[in-house]
Amino acid sequence: MTRKTRYLHQITTLILGGLLIVPAAAPPVSADIAATHVYHNHMPNFWAYYDLNTYNSTPVGSPIRYTYDGEVIQLKQNPPAGYPYYLPNGSPMPHDDLVSYYSHHAKTGAYLTWPWSVANTLHSSHPQAQMHVTMSGSVVNNVNSIIQQGNVSGYNNPAWGTPWKNAVTQLKTAGGDNRLDLIHFSGHHSMGPLVGNDYLLKDMIYHGATMAQPYFLGSSYKSSKGFFPTELGFSERIIPVLNKLGIQWSVIGNNHFSRTLKDYPLLDSPGTDTMISPPNRSDLQNVSTAGAWVNEPMFNEQQVVYNKYPFASTAHWVRYVDPATGAESRVVGVPVAQAQSWEEGYLGQVKADALKPYENLVAQKQIFVVAHDGDNSSGRAGSEETWRNAGNVTYADSGVTGMGIDEYLRSNTPAAADVVHVQDGSWIDTRDSSSDPAWYHWHLPFGIWKGQFAAFNQVNGTAYAPKKNLAGVEEGMTVSFEKGYHYLERNFALLQASLNYAKTAEQIWLEEHPNYWKPANPLDREVTYEGNQLNPWMLSYPVKGNPANDYAGGANPAELAWYFLLPAMDSGFGYYDENVDDSVKPALSFNQSLYFSKPYVSQKLAKDKTGPSVWWPQRYPYNPGSANVSKAEGWTLQHYNNAFAIYTYAFDTSGISEIKVKVRAHRDKTADAADNTFKVYDPAGLAAAGIANIDPAKVGAWTEYPMNVRDLSADINGVDWQPSSMTIMQKVPATDIGNLYFSYISDYRDQLLDYFIEAKDAKGNVTQSDIQQVYVGAGKYKLANGKYTESMQGTIEGTHPFITDVPAVPDTEAPAVPANLQATVMNASSVGLSWNAATDNIRVTGYEIYRNGVRIGTTPSTSYTDSGLSASTAYEYRVKAYDASGNLSGFSAAATATTPAGNHVTVYYKQGYSTPYIHYRPAGGTWTTAPGVAIPAAEVAGYNKITINIGAATQLEACFNNGSGTWDSNGGSNYLFGTGTWTYTPTGKIQAGAPVAPSATPTVAPTATPTPKPSVTPTVTPITTPTVAPTLSPTPTVAPTVKPSATPIATPTVTPTVSPTATPTVVPTIAPTATPTTSPSATPVPTATPAGNSATIYYKNTAFSNSYIHYKLDGATAWTTSPGVQMQASTFSGYKAITIPLGSATGLTAAFNNGSGIWDNNGGSNYHFGTGSSSLTGGNLITGEPQADSVTFRVSVPGSTPANAPVYLTGSFNSWNAADPAYLLTRGSDGIYSITLNLPAGSAVTYKLTRGSWATVETASSGADITNRTLTPAGGAQTVTLTVQRWKDQ
């Protein structure tokens, strides 16, 4: 029989009471400690891209491949024609600098030299030692791809796999095991407990097929006995997959053993153990009376790991019981020293000292397993010295023997009855959720971060706020199934759709091909299990099959669907937050998988016998009725009442017709790991069938709860209140997604429960999830000495966990009436309005403007300009406020204004442009915004006509355009029209009076169509648009010599400026007038622009919807007429601009206002501008054009800061992630740490400095916590200088 068959036979024998490896009576063991190392090497397929358009034209038998990393480097350097994926900044996706990644010595050493070199050294000095190493399938293919492409220095040996093969096959331990043991792993770094067993099985088969590729181990590949779970993330749910592939043992984090002991000491100390919630009491199933509890602080970190030795330092059996049949699967669980593994990865060496006090307390030898990355570019994990320190330091220590896991189990296999329960969870140092059994580093229930509520409420028209804990503190994250969102959670909803299509394609294909493929040679059997299945070589390395001949000679649609699906769920895509485009890498693979599975399944849907894909049931909170302090609460300690939710994501190709949660209560408040009663759906039935360890009296009947559904199709590619995430998601839009199903349950208190989800599709196919357990606490608390303690006798009801589980109360409250409406006459044809902001119970979203009782417009701001009015006319204005729900306030008090008499200019324009625009200003006044105003058709055929009120001015300066950038501006000199009526033809001819109607419609277009763009495009300001004055310059009849008693007095509501008491220093009370001595002739001749200096001023003030500059030239006494000259939009976002001729002056003095009495005058000192360009925002005046809004933080740190310690900025802009790599500061040669961020002007942020965790956050010099730092960026380029007084851990 095969090796796998032999092993399964051995397990069966063990279950029946026989022996596996050691005799029933274990011999005495020595007191020394066994020690070994596990090194993890991996790089993702960073961009598993395949041009689907090439599939149909690919010849049969040709390889079908997504890009490995060598090809990705080429793709980024030279994107192919039609390549569709680019970041918002225009660079090709992915963002990753792969050349830099792979060039690091940690990569080249771990992949190309260290492992076999160190194995040779161990071979000569430690006869029982093994190096257990993972080389993921993706990193093997990536390294080979880079060598083939030759695009990374150092990767140049085509036979790079030969030293690996030689070391694996030739170096043996004293017991005959592989010295270099390439243990099992999921090929694409997928986390089995999160992706599910179907996905994990395929990914592990892929890994085996990759190990057996000719460029790596080839035909010499032999399946290892061991397994390393991705991110050290283990669950008993994956044991059937390990058994199916003949795997005998798995490493598991040691604290996941300890957190299942019934004497766990920290249930009432939430957050103490690795900064997460205490274990749910349903996990406390094991008993150990030997040894003691030990707290192990992680080196240089805030987390403290709690373990009980020797229970957490000896191997035990762990098992899975099939809930339908009661059949058992089991493997040996080997504990990994979590804290010490981190320490070696950080410092480069570690000893087994923590275990020495507990030697010889039990029959088994303790084992000290150090497991960490072998290729990590940070810390010391990716160092040859660290690899060698296993033998030089750890195994050289007194009382410690280098002994691989296979060697250890040869004489230390657990007794058959030594079966324990292990808690779900992962590696210890994810920082935000260290080894959390809820896996919150890689997914998070749909929710709303505290800093997102403002945007959430604005988009949804709601008034939600974070709920508060019993101490009155707002939580950092609020779970909301109805309205929340999270990019990581989205991936698991997307997965259910692609997974179900792939599984259904596989089911249909294998049913149609009952003898399709099964292992036929020894290498096949090393890679996969026995029986009819998809071809593992084709789902790992497909070639084109013949679609016209049942895909003969290559991969069928099911194999292609799996091949393209497997790269999707690399856990690294969710490890570093959204990290530019990591969040959409799964969608790329999902879409490519669906390209092959969906059409195939759709054509054969009548043959669907696959049940719905249902993600393993989730619950929130993790500890119902008890204490929780996890990432899902935003690390806010919550003491909840007894309500909780069960939820999942589910999808079926035929549609889900029914889905429900089933819950049953236990008789007792505790359970035991050896008991099978609570592990099966039907205890009575299976007990009657002879399944051992079942007592039906221990559990009650199942109670069914229907599930609510949230259709996620509308949110498949993001939500509007998370715009940055949405922008990236829409670069690679997903196409199919599972829905969210959830049930709220509050019928239990102080009880142990089982639950599972059952779903049925439209064809009657049923899926039942695994059974899980939860202990629902009392939900009531006592308060003593400032601490809340759960108690059924408590008088304080816990906080309700949800805020959107009941329908939102409709907002029917109208905003308050706007006050202080002011109407200011601007000229003969326009009136400016301003008013005080109204208030509302949620938020005012805008205002309706009424003129003479008729609504004329709306605005989101508190000002409005009404244009196009008649001269010498009285107008009455009123304003209403409205909110997002459409509630309207009452009318404001009325404000009236009467326009003065004004001069008019009527222009007939002979059609040269099909839709002509006129861009104009009253001579010396303010220009319209380009392209100006469309000229309506005239009563005279072939002409357009417009009448313009120019107020007191006597001339109109203008040019014409087609609205799309083609201009007629009199060769850059513009046109001048006096008052009265004029006729213009595109030949440049201006004639007094209206045109004479032609006797016949012209049939020929004008001979001179005005197409050239003016030499100075008239788009923004009076200089960048028309600048030329009339031939005869007007002279003022009244000199501007009178100084006002008091000028602008209103204080801006937003802009941080001070209103002057009497500024600007000189403002004329009588506007200068100018009357030309004669009107322009029929063809006016413009005066040349005077030679001299000019000043171009860019001004940004988010409080002003309109900006005016009120100024005087240096050496002059005359100011412009208040409010001055209106500035126009510029090419720089948010900035208004103007260019002012200075003549012989060298500068000007100015103040700014909104045209309605709100001033920015530099605190009463005004601003001074020289020649050339200047930019002003938030009081920050710089020379030159505007710079992008940015803030450079320069941080001085205490002298006690560890050398080269990382310093991070954390705050409202990154959800308070204390170790966000995107906010890592750079240390300069002067010791100053700095980072530059693009923070928008005017948007306040709060923040602090950390060294990578909240244990190392900055404090006051006394060590006391400090309040959050705050900053409202002024705009433009800004530098903030900070000093850290002290770190919390010092």
UniProtKB/Swiss-Prot annotation:
Q: What class of enzyme is it?
A: hydrolase
> Known Pfam families for this protein?
CBM_25 (PF03423), fn3 (PF00041)
Enumerate composition-biased segments (Low complexity): 994-1008, 1016-1031
What Enzyme Commission number(s) apply to this enzyme? 3.2.1.1
Q: Which InterPro entries match?
A: Carb-bd-like_fold, CBM20, CBM25, FN3_dom, FN3_sf, Glyco_hydro/deAcase_b/a-brl, Ig-like_fold
Region (CBM25): which ranges? 902-978, 1092-1171
Q: How does activity depend on pH?
A: Optimum pH is 6.0.
Coarsely, its chief localization is secreted
Keywords, alphabetical: Carbohydrate metabolism, Glycosidase, Hydrolase, Polysaccharide degradation, Repeat, Secreted, Signal
What domain of life is recorded for the organism? Bacteria
Q: What is this protein called?
A: Alpha-amylase
State the organism named in the record.
Answer: Niallia circulans
Organism taxonomic ancestry: Bacteria, Bacillati, Bacillota, Bacilli, Bacillales
Q: Which gene encodes it?
A: igtZ
